[in-house]
A protein has these predicted regions:
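Bacterial N-terminal signal peptides that target proteins for export
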Residues: 1-11
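Bacterial signal peptide processing site
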Residues: 25-27
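Eukaryotic scaffold repeat domains enriched in small/polar residues
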Residues: 31-431
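C-terminal motif of bacterial Sec signal peptides marking the signal peptidase cleavage site
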Residues: 20-23
Length: 431
């Protein structure tokens, strides 16, 4: 099928957070009566805007990390790059953090790197190493692997910390976890964690016992289920069959049975990077499955989705934004960079776009429906929204790799339900 470009529907990625920070503009002419109030605002309110889309930002969430019984203190340290977040319930939110980062002298406690002056990027590999473990100029600060996997309650307080597994991610050329998830079809609620830099996929029991490792730690390649090349995400069918997006280097989707036995894979690098075809990938970054069993796969550096059946047959593709001036020599001309996506119970596709730093809604035919957000380091803005998740109360959580934070957004009273990210499919105990 032909690719459908949606470039004419993508809104500009310009976002003004607060007038007190960015300054004021001259007042605009009154809008037409039917558009004067947003759907998320009281009808009598004058002025204003959907600053955070149909949500209110929850301030000071999560709470600062506690000093641990292991003697690790947090004075002078702050949040690291946030690889992923998963809302099991409104009172159990799992966070995968790529280690804690040191604060420069004089910085306020728990200042995210995006809000330092000058700001810093929280992501990165071992100091002085590239993503492929080659020597590069050191940036001058380094993480420590503490609070890598932890759980917070609805108020943002830490209620669980897998301290016993912090060291699992501490290896030369590593950078910490890329994704944390639970299968919606698993009554035992196993926790899956993907470490892209170390090329492994871990499966844990709910209380933290490691029961399965796919891949060979620290070794990259493409060899069935024995070697991966920076895997990124996982998705399941109801019978437990699962698919791995592999990944930054692997240019493939790999299929496994419920016991972790390799079944097949598909995908290859583009023959012509300027004109990639079906089944050709540059950074297979996220994967989700619709109720009709179609696989929606993020081809990130090509700025698009590719859609397959469960046996790897290509079905369709569409782009998530304009093809303008890009900064990736492997995919010139792409502006949009879809980072992660959900297919909600009501069968819509929600995307966090790291190129435009927006949250986007599509139908499953690829038609653009709505979007909000924009780039910046201040609260409510985004710098690399790498993962998103929704709890049963409709709260939206985002994890940012460049800003070094997880943010919580609560639905605004009276918000248009069509603008709210819908429910994720999850194990309910009644299926």
């Amino acid at each position: 099928m032909r690719a459908r470009s949606l470039s004419h529907t993508l809104l500009p990625a310009v976002f003004l957070a607060t007038a007190g920070v960015w300054g004021c503009s001259p007042p605009a002419a009154d809008p037409p009566e039917e558009t004067a109030a947003t759907s998320a605002a009281p009808p009598a309110e004058r002025g204003g805007q959907e600053t955070y889309g149909p949500y209110d930002l929850v301030d000071n969430w999560p709470k600062p990390l506690p000093d641990g019984p292991d003697g690790v203190a947090h004075a002078g340290w702050t949040w690291g790059s946030m690889g992923s977040v998963y809302a099991e319930t409104p009172d159990r939110i799992w966070i995968a953090m790529r280690g804690e980062l040191p604060l420069p002298e004089g910085a306020e406690p728990w200042t995210p790197y995006s809000m330092l002056r000058p700001p810093r990027r929280s992501t990165g590999n071992d100091d002085g190493r590239s993503a492929t473990c080659e020597p590069v100029a050191p940036r001058g600060w380094e993480r420590r692997y503490h609070h890598v996997i932890f759980v917070v309650d609805g108020d943002g307080n830490v209620v669980q910390h897998w301290a016993q597994h912090d060291a699992l991610f501490d290896m030369t050329c590593g950078r910490g976890p890329h994704k944390i998830k639970m299968s919606p079809y698993d009554p035992d609620k196993h926790v899956w964690i993907i470490d892209d830099q170390l090329h492994v996929i871990y499966k844990f029991t709910y209380d933290g016992e490691l029961v399965l490792t796919l891949g060979t730690k620290g070794q990259r390649g493409r060899d069935a289920g024995r070697l991966f090349d920076r895997p990124t995400d996982i998705a399941w069918l109801p019978d437990g069959t699962f698919f791995i997006s592999d990944g930054y280097g692997g240019t493939r989707v790999a299929k496994f049975d419920k016991d972790g036995n390799f079944l097949m894979d598909w995908g290859q690098p583009p023959v012509d990077p300027k004109n990639p075809g079906p089944n050709e990938f540059n950074t297979v970054h996220s994967i989700a499955i619709g109720a009709d069993r179609r696989l929606f796969v993020v081809d990130r550096a090509h700025g698009r989705f590719q859609i397959f059946d469960e046996n790897g047959q290509f079905l369709d593709m569409f782009y998530t934004g304009p093809r303008g001036e890009g900064d990736d020599p492997g995919a010139p001309g792409i502006v949009s960079r879809p980072y992660s996506h959900l297919i909600t119970v009501d069968q819509y596709l929600w995307v966090s776009d790291g190129g435009t730093d927006r949250i986007l809604k599509y139908d499953l035919d690829g038609n653009y429906l709505y979007g909000w957000g924009g780039p910046g380091g201040w609260p409510g803005q985004f710098q690399g929204p790498h993962a998103m998740t929704v709890d049963q109360d409709g709260n939206l959580y985002t994890a940012e790799v460049f800003a070094g934070r997880v943010q919580k957004f609560r639905p605004t009273p009276g918000a248009d339900p069509d603008k709210l990210v819908g429910q994720e499919l999850r194990w309910s105990g009644s299926d």
